[in-house]
């Protein structure tokens, strides 16, 4: 019988981290070996007790390198799932790769230069690394539907809405959506008039191939995206709504199971072979 995949969760006490802990505890083929969080008031506490599962015998620590070192000594190839912050994610991933721990990254905010550097680092180390802007299967299907629709429409804009604790804007998911549309090789939104913003930023950020992205941050939201296509006489709106973070867990577990079989960096759930 195969041994379960050892998993460390970084950002374990955050909203996504807590859901990930629960998903790992419920799965038979993965096992939690580490929980990392920065908050001083949770250090040493059992992460199972914190998330409401009862004892898991995994104490919370803020020592990332120490935990990566311990995980690297496991019998099976270990994985670290990272839901932390844009300010530290680049360094977190480099440290994980250096220890041979396979990163599954749900934290957005990495720029293109950082992604390229991490890709080269992972390739050189022969380590798989997955950077996933959105773990929702439904969101992947929305992106695929947008690609199909974009063949018939020349005008498109993206609206993304998230909770007010999200640090980066626009979201990694919205950027990924725009990038996928841009890969079709067509330029969107040919100008109709000479625009003048009386308030800077009113028309949103201009992404690849002239695709505008608009960001909303409000309490009460979780994660939502609309891809809006326009043509004379009609509007087509594709929308995905996250009602509960549990919808991300099938994608998280898929990434954990797949990353150990890969070499180099892959960006996006849809690109996992």
From Swiss-Prot:
Q: Where along this sequence does the record place binding of NAD(+)?
A: 11-16, 106-108
The subcellular localization recorded is: Cytoplasm
Q: Which InterPro entries match?
A: DapB_C (IPR022663), DapB_N (IPR000846), DapB_N_CS (IPR022664), DHDPR_bac (IPR023940), NAD(P)-bd_dom_sf (IPR036291)
Pathway(s) of this molecule: Amino-acid biosynthesis; L-lysine biosynthesis via DAP pathway; (S)-tetrahydrodipicolinate from L-aspartate: step 4/4
| The protein's name | 4-hydroxy-tetrahydrodipicolinate reductase
Query: What task does this protein carry out?
Result: Catalyzes the conversion of 4-hydroxy-tetrahydrodipicolinate (HTPA) to tetrahydrodipicolinate.
**Example GO molecular function:** oxidoreductase activity, acting on CH or CH2 groups, NAD or NADP as acceptor
Detail which positions bind (S)-2,3,4,5-tetrahydrodipicolinate. Answer: 163, 172-173
Going by the entry's taxonomy, the superkingdom of the source organism is recorded as Bacteria
**EC number, as in UniProt:** 1.17.1.8
Please list the GO biological process terms of this entry.
Answer: diaminopimelate biosynthetic process; lysine biosynthetic process via diaminopimelate
Catalysed reaction(s) here are: (S)-2,3,4,5-tetrahydrodipicolinate + NAD(+) + H2O = (2S,4S)-4-hydroxy-2,3,4,5-tetrahydrodipicolinate + NADH + H(+); (S)-2,3,4,5-tetrahydrodipicolinate + NADP(+) + H2O = (2S,4S)-4-hydroxy-2,3,4,5-tetrahydrodipicolinate + NADPH + H(+)
Q: What is the first-listed, main subcellular location in coarse terms?
A: cytoplasm
Cellular component GO terms held in the UniProt record: cytosol
User: Active-site residues?
Assistant: 162, 166
- Hey, which family's this protein in? Belongs to the DapB family.
**PANTHER family, per the entry:** 4-HYDROXY-TETRAHYDRODIPICOLINATE REDUCTASE 1, CHLOROPLASTIC-RELATED, DIHYDRODIPICOLINATE REDUCTASE
Q: Which UniProt keywords apply?
A: Amino-acid biosynthesis, Cytoplasm, Diaminopimelate biosynthesis, Lysine biosynthesis, NAD, NADP, Oxidoreductase
């Amino acid at each position: 019988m195969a041994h379960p995949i050892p998993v460390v969760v970084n950002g374990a006490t955050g909203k996504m981290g807590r859901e990930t802990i629960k998903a790992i505890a419920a799965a038979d083929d993965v096992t939690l070996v580490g929980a990392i969080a920065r908050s001083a008031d949770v250090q040493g506490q059992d992460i199972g007790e914190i998330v409401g599962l009862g004892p898991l015998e995994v104490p919370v620590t803020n020592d990332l390198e120490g935990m990566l070192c311990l995980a690297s000594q496991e019998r099976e190839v270990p994985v670290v799932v990272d839901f932390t912050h844009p300010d530290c994610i680049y360094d977190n991933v480099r440290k994980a790769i250096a220890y041979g721990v396979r990163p599954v990254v749900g934290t957005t905010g990495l720029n293109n230069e950082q992604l390229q550097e991490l890709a080269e680092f992972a390739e050189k180390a022969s380590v798989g690394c997955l950077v996933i802007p959105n773990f929702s299967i439904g969101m992947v299907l929305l992106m695929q539907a947008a690609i199909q629709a974009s063949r018939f429409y020349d005008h498109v804009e993206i609206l993304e809405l998230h909770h007010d604790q999200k640090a980066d804007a626009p979201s990694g998911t919205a950027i990924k959506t725009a990038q996928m549309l841009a890969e079709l090789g067509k330029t969107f939104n040919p100008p109709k008039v000479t625009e003048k913003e009386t308030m800077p930023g009113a028309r949103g950020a201009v992404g690849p191939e002239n695709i505008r992205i608009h960001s909303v941050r409000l309490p009460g939201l979780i994660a939502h995206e609309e891809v809006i296509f326009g043509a004379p006489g009609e509007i087509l709106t594709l929308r995905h709504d996250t009602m509960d973070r549990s919808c991300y867990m099938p994608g998280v577990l898929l990434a954990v199971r797949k990353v150990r079989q890969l070499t180099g960096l892959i960006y996006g759930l849809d690109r996992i072979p």
